[in-house]
Each structure stands twice: as structure tokens, then as C-alpha cells.
């Protein structure tokens, strides 16, 4: 029995560990970043209220020393539009971590959004000292210099950004600089490189197509716009531009089909309704044209091109008082355009205000040094008032402009203007050999003459950050001459592109030019 007891004791030894004294638990120190994962999770889910609640709790625990919580709260403030508050929080982050280039970049970004571009440049330069190979710093420095109109420094910074890392947005801003400087060729070169780098970027393709459209290179314009629509069939900018090209060539029904697609995407677009209205004008549906143009004017009341077109349509409908109203409004916004004064003079002539019509014609002649139609209409008015000497002077000035256009271009004059000038020349006894009449190439075409419109090199770009064109025409009011009709002209104005890749930004095509015949 004793042996069994010994074996039992040997088989089950008594543990000595339980007899040792238990160690105390290590003290828990607050971890500043322990809630960062939860803050990040709420932020990327855009659950900002829950995110701010966690941030508040985290900052209370850490006594305001959690850098990430402050950083995310500053981002939320910026999204909510509280730029000044976000700036102060980002500055706090920069104090907590002075060697972080990201914090300085965010401080500079907030300064930029507040319009303090010089201060933003200083902070970006400090960030560049901490990280010299960050393309974003160079890009944003270039953007700041653009707003300060220091284009040379802006180009240097943007080129530096492209050397560090190529991005679509950098190409777009570099192209914007060339557009601001009026150098379309360099802008096209930049956008061509951008398209080579990013061939599926519809914004780049559309902008490049619009630049070619502005230069009158329709084949390349249509090619790039077509590529943009291939990648994005609902790209309303490209559709609007393509419709504008069709409208320019007189395909009004096809253009309206294109615009119907755009109307679903952007039903409140002023350029869209302007172009639709001028399509109806080309189809001689004047009531529909006025309705669409009135809607465009409601959406963009300060756009002078819409007012111009409204005046033009009312002139066509012989509603001269309404035409005077819209043309006067257009002149208030664009006081340096001679064609506006010419059409205003036509309206005044038909309203029997001859003295003011003469003043308007005189201003048109002073402002427009290239369009012979201004001088022709002025000569007609003077002839009808019995001032043959002054009428002859205007007629001779018209012939000089025609000769200049004939030497510099091969565009066509409208046959009605040719006929009217011949009648006036005969009445003034100077019309035996007009310098600008050419033989007709085939019986179906108009007279092969130089154009009544100015060549592209003489024209002022007519667009804004959207697609707006114009129907450039004129009407000479005859009373004593038997024809009783005025000259017409056809203009195709190039578009002016938006300066930034923003919705407002928005590059847009120009619209077609139409004709007006005023009896």
C-alpha cells in the first residue's frame, strides 16, 4: 500500500507555479492613432457625421494631438465649404509634423481656394524643399502662376511637372496658357502630345477637335470629335461641336437630330438653344427660332451673341423696334463690333430715324476695317438721302476692301450683294468695271467672287466658355432704288475655347452663319 501511495504522489506532482506571487498588469498608455482606421473607414464611405463624432472622441482622448484626426476633419471642412477653418486645421497639422510635405500641400491648397495665390506659391515652394520630385507641387505652382498672369513661370513649372510625371491635367493647363496667349498652333501641339499619351481621354479629343474647327480644318476636327464620340457616345460637347459643323454646311435637319441628344443631357444649356434657334432660322421657321433664342437669352441674359441673333431674326421678320432693342443690348456688351452697329443702322433706317442711322453707320465704318458690306449699306443710305458725294466715297472704300480680300483669299461674295453693288455703282455712274466680279464656274453655283465676309485672319474669335455662333448678315434698306433689297453675307466664325477643364469650362463649338434679306 505504501508503494502505491508513493507511485501516486510521483505520478501527480504538486504544481509550484500557483504558489508564486501574481505579476501586476502593465499600465495602458493612450495610443494616439488607435482610432485612425475607423476615421478612415467612415471618411471613405462619406459618412461624415459619424466620422466627425469619432474624430471628436479621438481628439478628446489625445488632447488634440492626433494629427490624422485633425487632417481628416480639415478635409471634411473643405468639402463643406469652410475653407478658412480647414486652413487653420491644416496649419495645425503642419505644426505637429513640420517635415510632412503633404501637410504643406494642403495648406497651400486652402490658400489657393481662398484666392491667395502668392501665399500659396510660398507654401508650395516650402513643400518643394521637402520633396523635390513631387509632380503635383510643380503642377499646382504652374496653376497659381497662371492666375497671376505670369505665363513664363507657369510654363516652366508645368514642363517640370511633365518631366517628373505625365498627367492629362498638366497638358490641359499648358494648352490653356497657349490659348490665353492666342497661340493656337502651340496649343494644338500640346493637345496632340496629350492625345498621344492618353488617346481615350474624351476631353482632350474634344478640345483638339474644337481647335481644328476654329482654324477651319474640318476634316481633322471631325476626326477627333468622332473619336471622342466613339469612346463616349453621350459626350455632349463633342455632339454639340459635330452638330455645329453640320449646321455650318447647311445640314440643319441632321444638326437638329444631334441637338436632340444633347437636350436630354444638358437641357438648360444656352449654347444648345442658341444653335437650335439658328437651325430653325436657316429653315426659315422664324417663330420657332425666336422661341428657342428667347429661351437661350433667359438662360444667359448677358451673352451678346444670343442678343445679336435675336436682333437678326427680328430684322428678318421686319420687326424693327424689337430688333433695335436686342441689338442695342448686344452693343452694350460688345461695343467694339462694327457689324452690330451696321445692323442697328438698318433697324434705325426702317424706323425712319435717319440721323441716328448715319451715326451708327459711321461708328460701324470706324470699327470695322475689313467688311465691305458696311460701306455698301452706308453708301446706299447716303444715296437715298441725296448725298451722292459721300455715297461715292463709301462706294470707293468698299472697292478697296474688296480688292484687299480678293488678293488675300479665295472666298465668295454673295450674289445678292454683287447685284446690289452693281446697281449702286450704275446709279453713281462708277459701276462699269467692278473690280471683284468673276465668271461663274457652273450654272448652278453663285458668282465666283471673293467673300463678303472677312477672312479668318481678320475675324475676332466669337465664342465664350460654351458653343455660341452667330449669323452674320446685313440688310441695306433701299427706298429709291428699284430693287428694294439689301445685301447679304455669310460668315462662319471660329469658336473660342474655354480656358479651363471645368464644366464651365467647357469648350464649345461655334455655330453656323446664316443669311438675312431685308426688304
Swiss-Prot record:
UniProt keywords, alphabetically: Bardet-Biedl syndrome, Cell membrane, Cell projection, Ciliopathy, Cilium, Cilium biogenesis/degradation, Cytoplasm, Cytoskeleton, Disease variant, Flagellum, Intellectual disability, Membrane, Obesity, Protein transport, Repeat, Sensory transduction, TPR repeat, Transport, Vision
UniProt similarity note: Belongs to the BBS4 family.
Protein name (database record): BBSome complex member BBS4
Disease: Bardet-Biedl syndrome 4: A syndrome characterized by usually severe pigmentary retinopathy, early-onset obesity, polydactyly, hypogenitalism, renal malformation and intellectual disability. Secondary features include diabetes mellitus, hypertension and congenital heart disease. Bardet-Biedl syndrome inheritance is autosomal recessive, but three mutated alleles (two at one locus, and a third at a second locus) may be required for clinical manifestation of some forms of the disease.
Subunit and partners: Part of BBSome complex, that contains BBS1, BBS2, BBS4, BBS5, BBS7, BBS8/TTC8, BBS9 and BBIP10. Interacts with PCM1 and DCTN1. Interacts with DC28B. Interacts with ALDOB and C2CD3. Interacts with PKD1. Interacts with CEP290. Interacts with DLEC1.
Tissue expression from the record: Ubiquitously expressed. The highest level of expression is found in the kidney.
PANTHER family per record: BARDET-BIEDL SYNDROME 4 PROTEIN, PTHR44186
Disordered: region residues: 1-25, 440-519
Residue ranges of TPR repeats: 67-100, 101-134, 135-168, 169-201, 203-235, 237-269, 270-303, 304-337, 339-371, 373-408
Amino acid at each position: 500500500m505504501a508503494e502505491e501511495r508513493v507511485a501516486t504522489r510521483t505520478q501527480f506532482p504538486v504544481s509550484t507555479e500557483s504558489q508564486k506571487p501574481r505579476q501586476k498588469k502593465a499600465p495602458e498608455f493612450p495610443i494616439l492613432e488607435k482610432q485612425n482606421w475607423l476615421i478612415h473607414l467612415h471618411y471613405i464611405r462619406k459618412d461624415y457625421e459619424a466620422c466627425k463624432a469619432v474624430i471628436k472622441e479621438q481628439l478628446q482622448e489625445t488632447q488634440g494631438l492626433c494629427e490624422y484626426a485633425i487632417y481628416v476633419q480639415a478635409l471634411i471642412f473643405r468639402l463643406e465649404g469652410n475653407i478658412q477653418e480647414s486652413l487653420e486645421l491644416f496649419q495645425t497639422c503642419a505644426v505637429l509634423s513640420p517635415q510632412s510635405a503633404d501637410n504643406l500641400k494642403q495648406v497651400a491648397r486652402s490658400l489657393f481656394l481662398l484666392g491667395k495665390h502668392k501665399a500659396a506659391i510660398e507654401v508650395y515652394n516650402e513643400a518643394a524643399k521637402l520633396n523635390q520630385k513631387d509632380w503635383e507641387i510643380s503642377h499646382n505652382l504652374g496653376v497659381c502662376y497662371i492666375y497671376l498672369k505670369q505665363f513664363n513661370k507657369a510654363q516652366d513649372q508645368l514642363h517640370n511637372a511633365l518631366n517628373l510625371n505625365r498627367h492629362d491635367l498638366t497638358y490641359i493647363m499648358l494648352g490653356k496658357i497657349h490659348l490665353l496667349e492666342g497661340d493656337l498652333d502651340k496649343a494644338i501641339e500640346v493637345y496632340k502630345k496629350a492625345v498621344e499619351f492618353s488617346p481615350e481621354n474624351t476631353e482632350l479629343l474634344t478640345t483638339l477637335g474644337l481647335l481644328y474647327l476654329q482654324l477651319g480644318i474640318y476634316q481633322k476636327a471631325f476626326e477627333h470629335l468622332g473619336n471622342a464620340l466613339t469612346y463616349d457616345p453621350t459626350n455632349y460637347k463633342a455632339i454639340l461641336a459635330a452638330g455645329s459643323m453640320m449646321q455650318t454646311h447647311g445640314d440643319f435637319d441632321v444638326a437638329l437630330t444631334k441637338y436632340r441628344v444633347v437636350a436630354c443631357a444638358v437641357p438648360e444649356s444656352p449654347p444648345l438653344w442658341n444653335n437650335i434657334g439658328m437651325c430653325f432660322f436657316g429653315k426659315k421657321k422664324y417663330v420657332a427660332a425666336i422661341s428657342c433664342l428667347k429661351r437661350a437669352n433667359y438662360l444667359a441674359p448677358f451673352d451678346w451673341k444670343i442678343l445679336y441673333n435675336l436682333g437678326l431674326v427680328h430684322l428678318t421678320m421686319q420687326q424693327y423696334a424689337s430688333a433695335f432693342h436686342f441689338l442695342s443690348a448686344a452693343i452694350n456688351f460688345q461695343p467694339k463690333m462694327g457689324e452690330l452697329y451696321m445692323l442697328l443702322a438698318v433697324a434705325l433706317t426702317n424706323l425712319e430715324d435717319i440721323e441716328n442711322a448715319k451715326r451708327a453707320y459711321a461708328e460701324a465704318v470706324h470699327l470695322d476695317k475689313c467688311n465691305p458690306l458696311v460701306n455698301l449699306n452706308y453708301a446706299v443710305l447716303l444715296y437715298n438721302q441725296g448725298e451722292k458725294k459721300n455715297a461715292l466715297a463709301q462706294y470707293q472704300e468698299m472697292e478697296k476692301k474688296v480688292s484687299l480680300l480678293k488678293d488675300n483669299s479665295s472666298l465668295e461674295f454673295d450674289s445678292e450683294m454683287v447685284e446690289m453693288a452693281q446697281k449702286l455703282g450704275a446709279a453713281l455712274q462708277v459701276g462699269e468695271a467692278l473690280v471683284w466680279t468673276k465668271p461663274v464656274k457652273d450654272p448652278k453655283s453663285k458668282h465666283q467672287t471673293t467673300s463678303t465676309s472677312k477672312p479668318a485672319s481678320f475675324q475676332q474669335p466669337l465664342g465664350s466658355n460654351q458653343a455660341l455662333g452667330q449669323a452674320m448678315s446685313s440688310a441695306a434698306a433701299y427706298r429709291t432704288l428699284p430693287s428694294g433689297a439689301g445685301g447679304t453675307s455669310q460668315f462662319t466664325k471660329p469658336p473660342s475655347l474655354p480656358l479651363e477643364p471645368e464644366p464651365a469650362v467647357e469648350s464649345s463649338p461655334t455655330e453656323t452663319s446664316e443669311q438675312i434679306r431685308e426688304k
